[in-house]
């Protein structure tokens, strides 16, 4: 991946901070919009670096919400392609089933260019200049009640504005079982992370935080039968989601439950979980500021493999919604 970037002239500046082992324990990076707030996680340094103007592009990875959430908190574009669309060579993989490379930029076009470069492919495989209004759907999942008032109002305002500028936006009933995703992903993620780290940490457990030790202990306690059943459930849910999503260029959902929280946490990933579980492509674009003058984002997702359609839809939405400006650095 890095070789592909260098091959097209990218200048690699350095490594950014992540949450500890790309898990729950936050790193020291703060949010450029408010230094008393987190920049999310796990790819917190990448999102903050792009938001602060340190670099125009950055790489991240996502198991659950580690690209979409920090991008939303920092007011930049974050893109997680379909599972398997980008190579994981050289990546520290903790979940074979879920981990995916993603990227951050200040525009949808730039993040599409980044994805093409990482893939070693012509940008035309990812990007289209067609700005025909996309066919959109909007979805309130079972997690809707966890979103604060500002997120709910912002989401409805975004949907209304996009509908006024393009075609009517559908509100389809979600496919059955969608709200099981949280439980299924957690089982797979914890099981695989615990076993991925077992050899490296054996006898050196004190090198990691209590938060991570607890996380890995929970995963180690999951029985093989429960893990295999979770994999089967994932397959069933993904098979139901793909034909449901395919008629639409993108499905609109919230990205986070609220503005960036304080730095002892990386924030709640629940609005990312379903799409990560299904291997669906997801992108977040800045859509407004909340009551604390911190960014809120609009997430768009699509059927697995529909990355190019998703990026085109996101580009149309990006120019239709008002810009949020830059952080007050």
Question: What residue spans do the PLM features occupy?
Answer:
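Acyltransferase
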Residues: 150-174, 198-203, 227, 231-248
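Short glycine/serine-rich loop segments
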Residues: 1-115, 278-297
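Conserved hydrophobic/aromatic pocket- or pore-lining residues that grip, position, or stack substrates
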Residues: 5, 27, 162, 197, ...
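General small-molecule cofactor/ligand-binding pocket signal
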Residues: 13, 126, 168-173, 283
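Short helix-loop capping/hinge segments that flank enzyme active sites or metal/cofactor-binding pockets
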Residues: 133-135, 187-242, 286-297
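Charged, often glycine-rich, active-site loop that binds/positions anionic groups
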Residues: 27-35, 181-196
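Glycine-rich, small-residue loops and helix-cap segments
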Residues: 6-15, 55, 112, 118, ...
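A short helix-breaking turn/cap at a secondary-structure junction
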Residues: 77-153, 157-158, 321-329
């Amino acid at each position: 991946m890095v070789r592909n970037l260098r091959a097209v002239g990218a200048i690699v500046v350095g490594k950014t901070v992540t949450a500890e082992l790309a898990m729950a324990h936050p790193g020291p990076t703060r949010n450029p919009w408010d230094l008393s707030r987190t920049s999310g996680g796990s790819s917190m340094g990448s999102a903050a670096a792009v938001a602060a103007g340190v670099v125009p592009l950055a790489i991240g990875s996502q198991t659950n919400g580690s690209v979409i959430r920090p991008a939303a908190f920092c007011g930049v574009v974050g893109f997680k392609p379909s599972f398997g669309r980008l190579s994981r060579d050289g990546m520290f993989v903790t979940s074979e089933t879920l981990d995916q490379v993603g990227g951050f930029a200040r525009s949808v076009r730039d993040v599409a260019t980044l994805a093409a470069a990482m893939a070693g492919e012509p940008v035309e495989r990812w990007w289209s200049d067609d700005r025909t209004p996309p066919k959109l759907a909007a979805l309130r999942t079972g997690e809707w009640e966890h979103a604060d008032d500002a997120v709910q109002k912002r989401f409805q305002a975004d949907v209304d504005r996009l509908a006024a500028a393009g075609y009517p936006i559908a509100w389809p009933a979600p496919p059955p079982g969608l709200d099981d995703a949280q439980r299924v992903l957690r089982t797979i993620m914890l099981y695989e992370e615990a076993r991925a780290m077992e050899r490296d940490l054996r006898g050196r457990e004190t090198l990691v935080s209590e938060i991570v030790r607890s996380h890995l202990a929970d995963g180690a306690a999951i029985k093989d039968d429960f893990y295999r059943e979770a994999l089967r459930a994932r397959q069933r849910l993904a098979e139901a989601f793909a034909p449901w999503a395919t008629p639409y260029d993108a499905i609109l959902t919230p990205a986070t439950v609220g503005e960036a929280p304080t730095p002892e946490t990386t924030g709640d990933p629940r609005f990312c979980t379903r799409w990560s579980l299904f291997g669906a492509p997801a992108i977040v674009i800045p859509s407004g500021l909340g009551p604390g003058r911190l960014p809120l984002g609009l997430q768009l997702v699509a059927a697995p493999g529909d990355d190019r359609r998703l990026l085109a839809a996101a580009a149309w939405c990006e120019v239709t919604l008002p810009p949020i400006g830059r952080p007050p650095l």
